[in-house]
Amino acid sequence: LQDHQVFGDGVAVVTGAGAGIGSGIARRLGELGMHVVVTDISVSRAEKVTEEIRVKGGSAQAQVVDVSKFAELDQLANEVFEQHGEVRLLVNNAGIETLGLTWEIPAERWEATLNINIHGVVHGARAFLPNILKSGKEAWIANLASIGAFAAMPTQAGYTMSKHAVESFSECLHLELELVGAPIHVCSVLPGMLKTSIFEEEGGAGEPDGARRHRAKMRELMAKHGMDLDEGCRRIVEQIAEGNFWVSTQPEMTAQLIEARVEFLRSQLPPKLGEQARQLICD
């Protein structure tokens, strides 16, 4: 089925939809005809994306949510079901990047990274699933992992380990829903490099001083090699609609990383840092 057939109506909830991939997915779903609940920790960002959807004839509402607080996700789920009675698509997208050596990153930044990137996904699914299951209708849950879910990267340990966790959670959730015979599709979304604001300087609050230079390098790399955001999000929505478990913006890159990961696991040797990655971090 094509995306306009699957997501031509119904309600979608997208977390972290005020910027980056979340905003691109929200806009695409609005174009297709869904009512989009645009959630973000920033009211101004959520309202901006909501207005962008409405200007193009779509239907959307803005909602302020901090996904690191499970009570706010519980409240969001209750309010959405009270207002609309259904959710066809839940996109657990909210996430932050954290750069720096493990022992130099403050405890507060570690807690924020893991709470947003892991617990935000888990509690998003936990909060919405009871009512989705009760409806008995076909639905979709898309969790944002990353191609980093199949790699190891020093100075990005928090982000990388969180994406490994999201991938593992998505696999387990898929099996659990299959176990109970629920008509719910789970997707693990594996974006490659897209042109987003994830490496902007304001996102680095609480990181060690040395991380600023790394952020600048990643911004340059993204500007040069990143895929257009709207094109990447169009591919994501299209593959979710097709029922793919793994959803990839750049399949060849994903396949290369998976092959390298399999070789690493088979070897049972310690991980090694490639020369390109070393230059990116150390130069």
Residue ranges and their predicted role:
Residues 11, 18-20:
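Conserved glycine-rich cofactor-binding loop
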Residues 178-250:
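SDR active-site lid
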Residues 101-102, 106-111:
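Substrate-binding pocket helix/loop in short-chain dehydrogenase/reductase
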Residues 125, 162:
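Active-site helix of classical SDR
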Residues 146:
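Residue(s) in the substrate-gating loop at a strand-loop-helix junction
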Residues 43-44, 64-75, 107:
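The beta1-alpha1 cofactor-binding region of Rossmann-like NAD(H)/NADP(H)-dependent oxidoreductases
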Residues 34-48:
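Conserved glycine-rich Rossmann-like NAD(P)H-binding loop of the short-chain dehydrogenase/reductase
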